[in-house]
């Protein structure tokens, strides 16, 4: 295809070089570009299973960053793609691209171009983006749609986070953390909630909240906002949006909404809910294979979004019943010695509280079972800002282990560590600075029936299997 533009891609995306191609979001875009007939090269700091998979699909991938990486594609790239957070502007490939006059564009801008000829459903919010997006995808697939999608975690059923579908719908997660959601102009926008976060980027809560108003202002003229009005921030957004003349569909626990959660109960590691939909005069039963009331609310948002795309409500409910979760969203890691271990991406106080609430609902199925929370704070700035709130959320568990801060892109802040949070926890708590000691310490206090959740956006996800191994060793 050298020198020839693939019919299903805009000219600037015919040949793309991706700096940091191994990242979850970047690799997903690479898969879609390849499946739509594009040529893709890329580089990353280290090899991974994801890169092996991309090579198998035809991508040219190099480990390490060097200006010569821009020569891997015949004719050279028509664009170089990168991300805001992970790649510095001094990266030698970006420097070389600018020297050659090759456009450097950000991943969200590429994703937005890939949606140009499709009906777009975009999900954003402080929490619940990935789960809600994934529910929409699974529901539409069950209804016979074959949507394209890009999501922040691997779907259990699909085993991937991105797909080029044959259908006319594109479903994606819109990241609010750095304002990149403003690249999109959705047909249907879903906002799960709005709560202070990412203040290291926005500076103030007001600036953070404003980006959601800017996002919904980009909804297409015949489009709609689907919004959870159980959340005060999202409810306020719904009112402001309706005042602009944009169609708003509300969901939550209150009567008279477009979709209402009337009742919810835990059923093993799943749930059953009674719901009502405004367009109908009878309640319905919604079954889920994932625990947690927050997941039931996410499912209501997915239901409204999917039906806006033309899906049948009965088929949507059937599809949601089979949704088995997303990697790292209250994912069951395994069981050993009667102890179940879950893993969750929770890295904000509200997410931590929701994960522990779901954990307690699971524990209540077994008399005498305890909830054990293992939390790794993510970012020093977030730890400092929300230390009190994190401590309050963690205090809802029966026993708590707090690890040291996962720094990610930040430098340490004086006086800020995992102990900053642990000191405020009212439940039995242990602060462990030594990551290698955590699994054994947790295994030493659990017994048959107990449920454990590891939480955080860092490498705490590695601990689940280690805890299970320690429990087996002590049996």
Curated annotation (Swiss-Prot):
Q: Name one GO biological process term.
A: regulation of cell shape
Instruction: List, alphabetically, the Gene3D superfamilies matched.
Output: Mur ligase, C-terminal domain (3.90.190.20), Mur-like, catalytic domain (3.40.1190.10), NAD(P)-binding Rossmann-like Domain (3.40.50.720)
Q: Which family does it belong to?
A: Belongs to the MurCDEF family.
By what name is this protein known?
UDP-N-acetylmuramate--L-alanine ligase
SUPFAM superfamilies in UniProt: MurCD N-terminal domain (SSF51984), MurD-like peptide ligases, catalytic domain (SSF53623), MurD-like peptide ligases, peptide-binding domain (SSF53244)
Q: In which pathway does it act?
A: Cell wall biogenesis; peptidoglycan biosynthesis
PANTHER family named in the record: UDP-N-ACETYLMURAMATE--L-ALANINE LIGASE, UDP-N-ACETYLMURAMATE--L-ALANINE LIGASE-RELATED
Q: What class of enzyme is it?
A: ligase
Q: Which cysteines are joined by disulfide bonds?
A: none
Please state the protein's primary subcellular location: cytoplasm
Does this UniProt record's set of keywords contain tRNA processing?
Answer: no
Q: What does this protein do?
A: Cell wall formation.
GO MF annotation, one: ATP binding
Catalysis: reaction(s): UDP-N-acetyl-alpha-D-muramate + L-alanine + ATP = UDP-N-acetyl-alpha-D-muramoyl-L-alanine + ADP + phosphate + H(+)
Which residues participate in ATP binding? 125-131
- Gene Ontology CC: cytoplasm
Q: What are the record keywords, sorted?
A: ATP-binding, Cell cycle, Cell division, Cell shape, Cell wall biogenesis/degradation, Cytoplasm, Ligase, Nucleotide-binding, Peptidoglycan synthesis
EC assignment:
6.3.2.8
Where does it reside?
Cytoplasm
Q: Is Cell cycle one of the keywords UniProt gives this record?
A: yes
NCBIfam families tied to this protein? murC (TIGR01082)
